[in-house]
Amino acid sequence: MSGEAIRVIVTGGTFDKHYDEIRGELTFRESHVPEILKRARVKVPVAVEPNQLIDSLQMQDENRRAVLDSCSRAEEDRIVITHGTDTMTTTAALLGAAGLEKTIVLTGAMVPYQVQDSDALFNFGEKRGQEAGDHRRSQKALCKIRF
């Protein structure tokens, strides 16, 4: 697929955690990405692919291979991956070593999207812009974390 279309691969991380008021802890239910895309008024075609909803500290080699497989199979040349920040660089290294002819950026959050003053919306928007700007210049997996 060419043009402006992008694929968003959802893996979980703090980005997608929900605060469970009953248990008083952060859990996973479903991804916040569809709501974020709506709020960000993204006008290009976007395919959202739920890959897994886990904390990146629990991500193992087979989980990373599932992300790589999704990237390999994607028709889109431009991919944004939501990912936990703790092991984002490990996944980025695997994706970069694969040598895919695609622009792949990973983004995460230090504060869940659902929580006030979260960095998730900003980080997603920044990566979308980075993905668009870097599309023709780089075919490596990019990973930047904003603190």
Residue positions per predicted region:
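Active-site histidine-anchored catalytic micro-motif
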Residues: 2-147
